[in-house]
Amino acid sequence: MMINIQEDKLVSAHDAEEILRFFNCHDSALQQEATTLLTQEAHLLDIQAYRAWLEHCVGSEVQYQVISRELRAASERRYKLNEAMNVYNENFQQLKVRVEHQLDPQNWGNSPKLRFTRFITNVQAAMDVNDKELLHIRSNVILHRARRGNQVDVFYAAREDKWKRGEGGVRKLVQRFVDYPERILQTHNLMVFL
């Protein structure tokens, strides 16, 4: 399958490359491994076991990036304006600080306790062409956050992950790129792990 981005002008070069990577991979064992990794990670995050998430799922060299894009009319695309902005662009140490903030008893945002439910969908997996220890996973996430009976937020995003096999054959997240579609947040905050 090939996408001609000159003809299909709405498709970015990055998206065309990604669809080609996953479209040609038909490995059901790899797909199952990817689904298991994401399901286990989602469970740890849902129960707010953040330290366990860092220890068991996240590699020390991780790059965790959440961006938001500005969607422009076709007539505005001729200008070289920055379309994306970083919401988060963190490494392992910065994620660790954010985890400690979440666990701080003085963090008023967690009182009363928050409840999370994640839905991970559209999971696609493919091995890296050059590094056989690197697994590419594309997925969509819907995150439901509830606090009290009347304060509910729903987040949704597309994710592109890289999971690398390390010591003991365990895969850990080394890169997560989250494309968050809202330019203006409809929620109270984005203090969540997507």
From Swiss-Prot:
GO molecular function: dioxygenase activity
InterPro entries hit by this protein: NTF2-like_dom_sf, Rng_hydr_dOase-bsu
Outcome of swapping residue 19 to F: In strain: G7
Role according to the record: Component of the naphthalene dioxygenase (NDO) multicomponent enzyme system which catalyzes the incorporation of both atoms of molecular oxygen into naphthalene to form cis-(1R,2S)-dihydroxy-1,2-dihydronaphthalene. The beta subunit seems to have a structural role in the holoenzyme. Also able to catalyze the cis-dihydroxylation of biphenyl and phenanthrene.
Heme keyword on record: no
Pathway assigned to this chain's UniProt record: Aromatic compound metabolism; naphthalene degradation
Gene name of the encoded protein: ndoC
Protein name as it appears in the record: Naphthalene 1,2-dioxygenase system, small oxygenase component
Domain of life per record: Bacteria
Family the entry assigns: Belongs to the bacterial ring-hydroxylating dioxygenase beta subunit family.
Keyword vocabulary terms for this entry: Aromatic hydrocarbons catabolism, Dioxygenase, Oxidoreductase, Plasmid
Oligomeric and partner information: The naphthalene dioxygenase (NDO) multicomponent enzyme system is composed of an electron transfer component and a dioxygenase component (iron sulfur protein (ISP)). The electron transfer component is composed of a ferredoxin reductase (NdoR) and a ferredoxin (NdoA), and the dioxygenase component is formed of a heterohexamer (trimer of heterodimers) of three large alpha subunits (NdoB) and three small beta subunits (NdoC).
Biological-process GO terms, alphabetical: 3-phenylpropionate catabolic process
Pfam families for the chain: Ring_hydroxyl_B
Keyword Oxidoreductase: yes
